[in-house]
Amino acid sequence: MKHLTTCLMALLLPLSSQAQSQDAFPDRPIRLIVPVAAGGGVDTAFRTLAPYWAEQLGQPVVVENRPGAGQAIGIDAVAKSKPDGYTLAGVGVPIAFNTALGRKLPYDPVKDLTAVAEVVTQPLLVVAHPGVAAKNLRELIDAARSQTNPLPYTSGGPGSYGHLWFEMVASQYKFNRQHIGYNGVAPALRDVLGGQVPVLIDAIVPTGTQVKAGKVQGLAIVRSTRSPMLPDVPTLQEQGLNLPNAAPFYGVVGPAGLPPAVLNKLNDTLVRALRSPALQAKLTDMGFDVVASSPEAYGRKIRQEIDLWSKIVRDNQIKAD
């Protein structure tokens, strides 16, 4: 009996140690890999969030930029990390779009990662050169449907959210269009300002500043209500357009197999941080809408986005590379 008791204690000790470790989580800094270069919207969002999250966790949140391959390099590093909650990623749209666009990835975004929380979204904005006769998106669609020549438009680049979203619009409302691809939104916006391309679809920041300055006209904000940043730009629903309020979304993921206690702690502290009025004010000023979702809701969102945009890519034969 003594021998049996000793054996049972030996078996239970590792489990007890693991439970105590999870109860003490976190007991050291958390590394948040942001898979883009410093300075962009994804990086700015997570660097703004990090100190507020750290305050709730009681440990520093160290942001580490690891760009490359459409965010795949940084995401893969997290997918292959130890599932202890100390290595996470702050990701953008490519968490779903890389798969939807058929890119070969060293990880599966559903099977190899754990969704922690959706953090923010950033509404899409449809703008046009002042010389365009249409004063809203409904008028632009009606004009495009009445002509045989394709409507030229641009976005943040081939395979960007604005690109795929407008392809969905064109498919639903059945008009010809031609996507003019640029390497990023800066050259695209420059040519819209110059009148070389009439229409641009991209996130509200930085494009919204040009609407405020009167250099382009805002045709629609892809949001359930008008944006505080651009209160004069109408929503889709106000224009009678039956389209989803899809938007670029940012969230936190970890490797597959995160212990439930660790996942709950990460989500709980992250949600509490995002409820801070000071942080919400900063993010709102940057053009973000705070979400602060559960792990289940964020995981479901990733799967839904993959399914939605995979169909758009297939139906419209979109190639991003």
State what each model feature region is.
Residues D108-E118, N176-I180, P198-V199, G208-A246, ...:
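Short beta-strand->loop
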Residues T5-L15:
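Bacterial N-terminal signal peptides
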Residues W53, K80-Y86, A100-P187, L236, ...:
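Hinge/capping helix and adjacent helix->loop/strand transition within the periplasmic-binding protein
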Residues D27-P29, Q172-F175, K212, E238, ...:
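An extracytoplasmic/periplasmic, membrane-proximal ligand-sensing/linker region
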Residues G41-A45, L49, G74, V93, ...:
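Stable alpha-helical elements in mature extracytoplasmic
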Residues A19-K111, P150-P152, P158, K174-A203, ...:
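N-terminal (or domain-start) structured segment
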Residues G92-V93, P130, A203-V205, R223-S224, ...:
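Short secondary-structure boundary segments
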